[in-house]
Amino acid sequence: VVIHTLPAMAQAAALAIDSMEWNEVVGTVAGDDTIFVAVREQDDVNEIVSRFKKLMKP
């Protein structure tokens, strides 16, 4: 899963994702404005995307 953030915010957001300790997430790699989220199983991708969408709702 790839997530785009505001410039210079990817590392902070990746740290927050890592701290959630979701079993489906193996880990994250963050650049300046992009995060790669490694998901354990292909079948878990839709669940993870759904969780991120819920977190981003206003």
What are these regions (language model features)?
Residues 51-57:
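C-terminal output/interaction extensions
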